[in-house]
């Protein structure tokens, strides 16, 4: 199905179609990091994260996931707020050739049990404030490991924000 009704108001200098690259989402990050290593990839509470740092963090986390037994095609729950940790975790899961299962941080026990059972996830990357909801699942589901992220890791120590 092709949608064209917007073409009448589309800017004339922009193409109406585009060819998608034959690359993975992770490869696109890798290319950006090689081309623009010192450009800002993420800003979090006034602290910029450069593409070089983002790629290094992603590679380290992907290596950790693989060392923990995450293999190609495994499903990994991603249960945290929008943050640099989310971005790093998302790309790291992809880099490990696993499948990202994003879980809304508003979900609690019943929904979490469903996600774990439905996807067969054995590993979860969770934000610190959500650990209390996901850690009990280690005893009642097939979940084997929870990695908890601390949100203050990437905060600029000199920020004047009220944290």
Q: What is each residue range found by the language model?
A:
Residues 1-22:
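Flexible, non-catalytic linker and terminal segments flanking ANL/adenylate-forming cores
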Residues 13-16, 25, 45-47, 73-75, ...:
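A short, structure-level motif marking secondary-structure boundaries and short turns
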Residues 17-21, 53, 100-103:
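Short, flexible loop segments at the rims of nucleotide/cofactor-binding pockets, characterized by
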Residues 19, 30, 38-83, 87-91, ...:
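Conserved AMP-binding/adenylate-forming core of the ANL superfamily
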Residues 21-25, 126:
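Residue-level signature of the cytosolic catalytic core of signaling kinases
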Residues 67-68, 95-163:
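Structural core segment of the AMP-binding/adenylate-forming
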Residues 2, 33-38:
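A short, compositionally biased
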């Amino acid at each position: 199905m092709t949608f064209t009704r917007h073409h009448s108001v589309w800017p004339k200098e922009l193409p109406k179609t585009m060819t998608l690259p034959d690359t993975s989402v992770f490869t696109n990050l890798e290319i950006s990091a090689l081309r623009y290593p010192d450009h800002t990839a993420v800003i979090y509470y006034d602290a910029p994260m450069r593409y070089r740092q983002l790629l290094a963090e992603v590679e380290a986390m992907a290596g950790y996931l693989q060392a923990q037994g995450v293999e190609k095609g495994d499903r990994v729950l991603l249960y945290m707020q929008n943050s640099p940790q989310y971005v790093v975790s998302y790309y790291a899961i992809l880099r490990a050739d696993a499948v990202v299962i994003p879980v809304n941080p508003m979900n609690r026990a019943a929904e979490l049990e469903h996600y774990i059972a439905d996807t067969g996830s054995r590993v979860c990357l969770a934000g610190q404030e959500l650990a209390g909801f996901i850690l009990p699942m280690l005893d009642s589901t097939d979940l084997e490991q929870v990695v908890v992220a601390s949100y203050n890791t990437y905060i600029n120590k000199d920020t004047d924000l009220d944290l």
